[in-house]
């Protein structure tokens, strides 16, 4: 079984359940005077995380009604649609969202929340399913991606 790299952070108590996913959106204004804010804000903005374990520590928090809890999180895989040219398992890609409008029925799948444009991801699975219509290019393919782990060699052309 693959061991996910985890980080200790603090989340609102309503999110402190294994399997809960969230997208870290950054620091709130109320965090400026908090003495433990550094632990809450050790994640990368815009990335999707999954709670994998709960720790015993709980904290009062001006942002989260009901307080906050210390947890272990790992970056969560995200399903998205990509060009069929790059939809290959175990391929590293630099995400570039297609230029289309929000009226497109596959816009959310091609521009998923939790994926940061310009960052490197690994396609872990090419998922079966119906082809999605696309007005700006070839029908995008549904894949599962994870961020390129830190410490792996990064090729930069």
Swiss-Prot record:
Organism domain of life: Archaea
Family that this chain belongs to: Belongs to the UPF0179 family.
Protein name, entry field: UPF0179 protein Mhun_1135
Source taxonomy: Archaea, Methanobacteriati, Methanobacteriota, Stenosarchaea group, Methanomicrobia
